[in-house]
């Protein structure tokens, strides 16, 4: 764990001068490096796969701690049952370490659910809109299967129109069902 902490911290430069040669490039001011590192950290927090990868070592550590505390408690309870005095009167609480373990498991479950939802949306997007619009960040790059923006807009408008038609059909159907429901109840 200490090795991970050492790798994530930018190297310290000499004092003086407003710039430092760091891990992000030579001549970049320290404040800018910290800001870029902060942005990278925020991006990793939003990515469920990266978050999952970060939580796995914590889960392993928590499980090891949980097993260690369980073993200590078992030894202490065995000594008490055998009538032996225990010199280690201070044993950590099992319930707190179990709660920590379950909290990490819950976070992992949320990350997996979010990753699954992102993947499902990506598949649905590729299925219903398989062609891409050229990105503004790379106007020089030629994308073979891309649509011009005007065609993309017309496709989106047709999808919205279809969704509205489905919505209206469902509303009409529900009104018909509601209209028939009082008649069948009145006949009873």
Swiss-Prot record:
Keywords: Activator, Nucleus, Transcription, Transcription regulation. The keyword Nucleotidyltransferase does not apply. The keyword Chloroplast does not apply. Residues 1-11 have a biased composition (Polar residues). It comes from the Eukaryota. It is found in: Nucleus. Residues 1-27 are annotated as: Disordered. Coiled coil: none annotated. It holds the Pfam family Med29. One of its GO terms (cellular component) is mediator complex. Component of the Mediator complex, a coactivator involved in the regulated transcription of nearly all RNA polymerase II-dependent genes. Mediator functions as a bridge to convey information from gene-specific regulatory proteins to the basal RNA polymerase II transcription machinery. Mediator is recruited to promoters by direct interactions with regulatory proteins and serves as a scaffold for the assembly of a functional preinitiation complex with RNA polymerase II and the general transcription factors. Component of the Mediator complex. Belongs to the Mediator complex subunit 29 family. This is Mediator of RNA polymerase II transcription subunit 29. It comes from Xenopus tropicalis (Western clawed frog).
